[in-house]
């Protein structure tokens, strides 16, 4: 099985070219199949069911071809990954037998689509002898992928598969369609609820996965009595507990201490914090002299010089609360304090006080 005419670099380059060409063809054929589905929906809406079935058979073949191209793409990737084995070993490695034989078998069937695939097959035949290549092309060696052979076969797709394609196309485009009851009755037991089975004749027996571009999938494998077991649910991952900060012991009372501080002493009440800020010194003096009339508050007052200091203190106290200045408050300071000189009120200039009072009112 040893050949002497292999060119390793040429084989490597063409394997990469085959992969790129296959990816482009898969994308192109998938887009064309999507457009063809819209045409089939129009046929169903117009009542042309037979014509729609013919078009669906063509779509199924294209989907099979896309799946076959995906399989070949994987085999080319495998050969590139193990290219060192191909170069170093004289005999064919058992792990590469299926990949090599499948590529040689598919080359004459897809060389019109992918011309580089024929070059790859010729290089592999040069490496492992022409006799080996002949055995692979006829599958006499028995290592060609059976699923790929099914996808590239010339047999017509099953009727039940055609009906399922039509049902799904009608559902996607909201077109009324009544499937053929005779064909649906011939479906194998246990597969009636399946959406689309792209090869339930061979692939279900082998359990091979469906990777087609037409939305196909593999039906579950049936038992000896023809029944299909229910699939086991996937184990759900355990949710991760999110991190959370510890909650506070209780809400706080803005008028006192936090709630719960004095629960052990029910007879003791926390001191209440006044809602208003503490006022200046003369408030107590004003409350102490409640019986003084308004005329006495304004009349007897100090000389013009002392009121300047209490006025500035009053302004500093109420700056943060945006309260207007009260002109009458500073006049009470000397009268409320004990031992104040009451005779000084005779020297007060009432005209001057009135003028200043009016000016203060205008400012506020």
UniProtKB/Swiss-Prot annotation:
Keywords on record: Cell cycle, Cell division, Cytoplasm, Cytoplasmic vesicle, Cytoskeleton, Nucleus, Phosphoprotein
Modified residues (Phosphoserine): 4
Region (Disordered): 292-352
GO biological process terms, semicolon-separated: cell division; protein localization; protein transport
Example of a GO cellular component annotation carried by this entry: cytoplasmic vesicle
Cytoplasm in keyword set: yes
Polar residues bias (residue ranges): 334-345
Keyword Transmembrane helix carried by entry: no
Localisation per UniProt entry: Cytoplasmic vesicle; Cytoplasm, Cytoskeleton, Microtubule organizing center, Centrosome; Midbody; Nucleus envelope
Coiled coil residues, start to end: none
Modified residues (Phosphotyrosine): 43
Pfam families with a match to the protein in the record: Ist1
Function: ESCRT-III-like protein involved in cytokinesis, nuclear envelope reassembly and endosomal tubulation. Is required for efficient abscission during cytokinesis. Involved in recruiting VPS4A and/or VPS4B to the midbody of dividing cells. During late anaphase, involved in nuclear envelope reassembly and mitotic spindle disassembly together with the ESCRT-III complex: IST1 acts by mediating the recruitment of SPAST to the nuclear membrane, leading to microtubule severing. Recruited to the reforming nuclear envelope (NE) during anaphase by LEMD2.
PANTHER family listed in its UniProt record: IST1 FAMILY MEMBER, IST1 HOMOLOG
Family designation: Belongs to the IST1 family.
Quaternary structure (record): Interacts with CHMP1A, CHMP1B, VPS4A and VTA1. Interacts with SPAST, STAMBP, and USP8. May interact with VPS37B. May associate with the ESCRT-I complex. Interacts with MITD1, in competition with VSP4. Interacts with SPART (via MIT domain); leading to the recruitment of SPART to midbodies. Interacts with SPAST.
Protein name, UniProt field: IST1 homolog
Native species: Bos taurus
Recorded name of the encoding gene: IST1
